[in-house]
Amino acid sequence: MEKLRELLPKDQYEKIAAINNPYLHEFLAEWIEWLEPSKVFVCTDSPEDEEYVRWKALYYGEEKMLEIPKHTVHYDNYYDQARDKTNTKLLVPKGVELPFLNTMNREEGLKEIREIMKGIMRGKELFICFFVLGPTNSIFTIPAVQLTDSAYVAHSEFLLYRKGYEEFKRLGPTKNFFKFVHSAGELDERKTSKNLDKRRIYIDLLDETVYSANTQYGGNTIGLKKLAFRLTIQRAVKEGWLSEHMFLMRVNGPNGRKTYFTGAYPSMCGKTSTAMIPWENIVGDDLVFIKNVDGIARAVNVEIGVFGIIEGVNQKDDPIIWKVLHSPVEIIFSNVLVKDGKPYWNGMGIEIPDEGENHSGKWWRGKRDAEGKEIPPSHKNARFTVRLEAFPNLDREALNNPCGVEVGGMIFGGRDPDTWPPVREAFDWEHGVITMGASLESETTAATLGKEGVRAFNPMSILDFLSVHIGDYIRNYLEFGRKLKKTPKIFAVNYFLRENGRWLNEKLDKAVWLKWMELRVHNDVDAIETPIGYIPRYEDLKVLFKQVLNKDYSREDYEKQFKIRVPELLAKIERIWKIYEPIDNIPEELFKQLKDERERLLKAKAEFGDYISPFTLEKRI
């Protein structure tokens, strides 16, 4: 504490002294001394401290005001627009091998990042902020402390997470907290990170600390988001619960029944549009914790806000998000085009000005970058950051419930033109975890240009964020389900089937699949058994299409969408098998499930041929 007394002005020192936690004090003293900021501000949970951070983001030029009250814009460096996968490394002890993951020797990594960060905050203000992941004072709560010299990063976290200063005071001397140290480094005249050659995001799994330097882009800097996610996955696998890259939503069933679903979809597979269906309710759009509470799987949203991709958001397809983005609620727009105080983005469905300011500086239509590429009005990864409370379809009770909500179903959303049917249900937990979750693929969206895209393997949509061996991750999933008294049903969806280049489904058909899944969770409708799980009966979907979308649904459409495509399904099993086969430590159950599914498909092929009509299988029941 003496060291902190020397380093901090009296008013800021008193805020830290009120937290009785020597581990925290030691960490802060070490890093304040090392970073050498000219000024330190400690954020409590007071509205005044949050307002101070908001004001400093404008004062230091990291954000600018827009025309609508409470709206601001932030720009990242032209070359700092996405997660830096190359320089994001997991620091692991010598000899640890993690397939698919970008690892580095822990001692070397810590030495390098300390050198880069020595004195990096000279002439700058350090913000020390306290937050929690999950609801406060709950079995899901994980406290975290963020050190950053970016008021934009701190402001973003106030929109995305629950405040945690009082929680730190309540918890007292615990080591059970995450630590994030970030510096944007030297800034250029546009107030964006300058030294991108020294951009590093190092995740120390042993000490549950993340270091991030010379970057501002949210995915590299907002400690509690995807950086903390690596730490929570590791902790979940150690402790036997699930930390997942999933939405959490409520589907409204008959007679006021509420059923909650989680959903894991790789990008461009329909995750946000599913969670935002206007007549259902959102709890969260990105990260969930799922724990076994008295034999029931219960889930919480880790966050209280949305850090969403803005590209393509338009009034017709995204009425709720569109309305929020035009309301006077607190929003940070990043890397969009601004003209006369108004933000514009690609695909917004209205005319975009021919000039303005964007992530490249002064912009005009046809402007090219150093590589000769034409610069679009907004970056394809441009974002909006806003609290969930701004959404009229928010299920507030579920968001704030410290016990979480019961998970009725888990959805895995893939993207392919010719393999998975639009919706199906797993035979059981193990079958779903392996053949749906651990086999998830998404066709890269080059497909929309008429080229067949590459199928990217992305189990549980978590590959970019894994921090443990994939075998341990899958084993934990299987074990978690075995210990439940009541397991959630598992479903797989695919909104992107095509035939002769035409989509087989319309955008809103997914609303019908959700209602069918809700009925299946409660065993209200029968289903057809196929070699790959249960699919809907035509009669049930016909009723739902009329009820939900007021649409007629033809037998022909049903047959095209739900036929079992045996050759493509067998090819997929082959692909997935080849990915897992060379890796050590993969649970036996994975190969058994794939083998059993292959045998069921071959048997069906021998009886019915390569392409099997759902009506043929229904007759057999």
Curated annotation (Swiss-Prot):
Active site: 269
Any one GO BP annotation for this protein: response to starvation
Residues annotated to bind Mn(2+): 226, 245, 286
Cofactor comment: Binds 1 Mn(2+) ion per subunit.
Localization annotation: Cytoplasm
InterPro entries xref list: PEP_carboxykin_GTP_CS, PEP_carboxykinase_C, PEP_carboxykinase_GTP, PEP_carboxykinase_GTP_C, PEP_carboxykinase_GTP_N, PEP_carboxykinase_N
Cofactor: Mn(2+)
GO-annotated molecular function: GTP binding; manganese ion binding; phosphoenolpyruvate carboxykinase (GTP) activity
Keyword ATP-binding: no
Short name of one Pfam family: PEPCK_GTP
This protein's UniProt keywords: Cytoplasm, Decarboxylase, Gluconeogenesis, GTP-binding, Lyase, Manganese, Metal-binding, Nucleotide-binding
Catalytic activity: oxaloacetate + GTP = phosphoenolpyruvate + GDP + CO2
Enzyme class at the top of the EC tree: lyase
Binding site for substrate: 83, 217-219, 267, 381-383
SUPFAM superfamilies: PEP carboxykinase N-terminal domain, PEP carboxykinase-like
One GO location term (cellular component): cytosol
Its EC number(s): 4.1.1.32
Protein family (similarity comment): Belongs to the phosphoenolpyruvate carboxykinase [GTP] family.
Task performed by this protein: Catalyzes the conversion of oxaloacetate (OAA) to phosphoenolpyruvate (PEP), the rate-limiting step in the metabolic pathway that produces glucose from lactate and other precursors derived from the citric acid cycle.
Protein name: Phosphoenolpyruvate carboxykinase [GTP]
Gene: pckG
